[in-house]
């Protein structure tokens, strides 16, 4: 673990290359975290056999997307609950795939014909399943968050580097046409340096699972802080990753207040609301807020630059330019603009694109993106936020390992 916890991103990519993961460093889009990856740039004619581990609600999205990814064949489904995998396959498979079914992950991993697995299980299980799959010589696509602690992330990165297999994480906004258009606008408009962000995830409470959805006697994991990480992990994983993408800098300190305060919801010890402030090495600051009792509309994500304010939401990006009072108005001050970010992507959120890209990674034509380093950055913030709330102090990210 100690050999991986302090790897810089450039070092991580270099070691990954030596381990046989993807292309050499030169010319890859990952040298700058803020780059926009072109998902369809290098098509593959190969077909990779995938096993699905975890057939819960999130698997609907992944399986549905795989119907549109001919490079990946759904070969095996695994879930602890008997017949749950069969039911999910019958519901979601539309491309004629006929997978085998398992209740024991280790038995599925023995399939020699299996090239890769998708890990779509509760957050606290990711580390052990990912490591088992890598040790079984499988490429791994793992849903977010990477894990619940930085220590677990470091262990996963170490096994990944030794395995020589690909490990990619499912923060799909990095592959979403909408978010890539946002990043492209950020780079091509004269907005200046991004100094601060104000981001929110306000939503309703989690759905009520069916009585037979989990093994008998197993409580709903999303209501358990130790298993889910609470509202910051459950909802922050997406937008915090986007913020890291925009800031293109390392988080260095985290402060948070959070807890359970809406007792009209189901009984839980997982936080139902949170406020988080993060300082980055480049001086930028993120403000994040989330809750699971919103019955109104979502707030806009706002980024404040030295020359402009950007607000994103509802498929649109608005940019308003300005200058400080007391200074002459710049002659070339651009007009405010509203940019449509909604393209013709029928899935909408980047899931199909990230799976196409994962096939290219397995074919050696791309590097995993997001990789373990990128995914770990979000965990640094989220674990730091939870510890800050528990210990009532600012957390230095270096404390987390």
Report residues per predicted region:
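Beta-strand-loop-alpha-helix segment that lines the small-molecule cofactor/substrate pocket
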Residues: 116, 122-123, 127-175
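A structured beta-alpha segment of the ubiquitous adenosine-cofactor-binding alpha/beta core
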Residues: 100-114
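C-terminal glycine/acidic-rich active-site capping loop/insertion
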Residues: 211-216, 242-245, 253, 266-271, ...
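Predominantly a Rossmann-like dinucleotide-binding segment in NAD(P)-dependent oxidoreductases
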Residues: 54, 162-168, 173-267, 276, ...
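C-terminal helix-rich "cap/oligomerization" subdomain common to oxidoreductases
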Residues: 14-44, 118, 359-401
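N-terminal secretory signal peptides and thylakoid transit peptides that target proteins
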Residues: 2-20
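N-terminal Rossmann-like dinucleotide-binding module
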Residues: 18-95, 176
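Glycine-rich phosphate/pyrophosphate-binding beta-alpha loops
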Residues: 237, 263, 289-297
């Amino acid at each position: 673990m100690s050999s991986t916890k302090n790897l810089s991103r450039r070092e991580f990519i270099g070691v990954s290359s030596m381990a046989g993961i993807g292309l050499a460093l030169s010319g890859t889009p990952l040298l700058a975290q803020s780059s926009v990856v072109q998902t369809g740039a290098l098509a593959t004619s190969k077909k990779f056999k995938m096993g699905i581990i975890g057939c819960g609600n999130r698997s609907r999205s992944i399986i549905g997307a795989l119907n549109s990814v001919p490079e990946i064949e759904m070969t095996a489904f695994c879930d602890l609950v008997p017949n749950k995998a069969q039911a999910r396959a019958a519901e979601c498979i539309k491309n004629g795939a006929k997978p085998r079914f398992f209740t024991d992950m280790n038995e599925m991993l023995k399939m020699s014909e299996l090239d890769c697995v998708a890990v779509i299980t509760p957050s606290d299980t990711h580390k052990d399943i990912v490591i088992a799959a890598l040790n079984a010589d499988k490429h791994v696509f793992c849903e977010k968050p990477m894990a619940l602690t930085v220590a677990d992330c470091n262990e996963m990165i170490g096994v990944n580097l030794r395995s020589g297999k690909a490990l990619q994480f499912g923060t799909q906004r990095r592959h979403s046409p909408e978010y890539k258009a946002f990043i492209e606008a950020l780079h091509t408009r004269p907005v200046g340096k991004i100094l601060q962000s104000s981001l929110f995830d306000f939503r309703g409470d989690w759905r009520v699972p069916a009585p037979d959805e989990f093994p008998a006697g197993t409580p709903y994991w999303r209501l358990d802080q130790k298993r889910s990480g609470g509202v910051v992990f459950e909802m922050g994983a997406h937008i915090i990753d986007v913020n890291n993408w925009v800031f293109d800098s390392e988080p260095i300190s985290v402060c948070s207040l959070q807890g359970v305060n809406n007792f009209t919801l189901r009984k839980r010890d997982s936080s139902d609301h949170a406020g988080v402030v993060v300082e980055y090495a480049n001086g930028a600051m993120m403000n994040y807020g989330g809750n699971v009792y919103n019955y109104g509309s979502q707030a806009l994500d706002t980024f404040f630059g030295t020359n402009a304010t950007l607000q994103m939401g509802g498929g649109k990006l608005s940019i308003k330019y300005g200058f400080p009072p007391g200074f002459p108005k710049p002659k070339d001050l651009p007009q405010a603009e509203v940019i449509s970010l909604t393209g013709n992507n029928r899935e909408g959120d980047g899931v199909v694109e990230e799976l196409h890209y994962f096939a290219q990674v397995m074919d050696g034509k791309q590097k995993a993106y997001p990789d373990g380093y990128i995914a770990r950055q979000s965990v640094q913030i989220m674990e730091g936020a939870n510890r800050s709330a528990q210990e009532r102090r600012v957390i230095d990210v270096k404390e987390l390992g």
